[in-house]
From Swiss-Prot:
Pfam families found in the cross-reference section: Motile_Sperm (PF00635)
Gene name per UniProt: msp-63
Signal sequence annotation: none
Note: Around 30 MSP isoforms may exist in C.elegans.
Function: Central component in molecular interactions underlying sperm crawling. Forms an extensive filament system that extends from sperm villipoda, along the leading edge of the pseudopod.
Species per Swiss-Prot/TrEMBL record: Caenorhabditis elegans
Keyword tags: Acetylation, Cell projection, Cytoplasm, Cytoskeleton
Ranges in a coiled coil: none
A GO cellular-component term linked to this record: cytoskeleton
Classification via InterPro entries: Ig-like_fold, MSP_dom, Nematode_MSP, PapD-like_sf
Identification of the protein by name: Major sperm protein 63
Gene3D superfamilies assigned to the protein according to its UniProt record, in alphabetical order: Immunoglobulins
SUPFAM superfamilies assigned: PapD-like
Residues carrying N-acetylalanine: A2
Amino acid sequence: MAQSVPPGDIQTQPGTKIVFNAPYDDKHTYRIKVINSSARRIGYGIKTTNMKRLGVDPPCGVLDPKEAVLLAVSCDAFAFGQEDTNNDRITVEWTNTPDGAAKQFRREWFQGDGMVRRKNLPIEYNP
């Protein structure tokens, strides 16, 4: 069963952080790539620490081994310097899909006792 094997690695491009540059009076969109570098199909979900300011499209999906997806990370307009941005980040969560499951994302994959891995990508805002 897929859930007894820990999920393999993913890669993200960029690898360590996402950077948005001023001015912040307009919506910015930044593309990131998530690559399933493991030998198993995975389900992934993206979380943000600031739902008002940050959005991700698509927020979840399924990737076959070696498959990649391009995500659009958007930052809505905000008053730079007047809001706390220190803890802003995007978290990629992923888990192996059950053997024989259709290639359609299911939230319950993350709610059972299977192992879920996480990768944090901090957001940096340049003035």
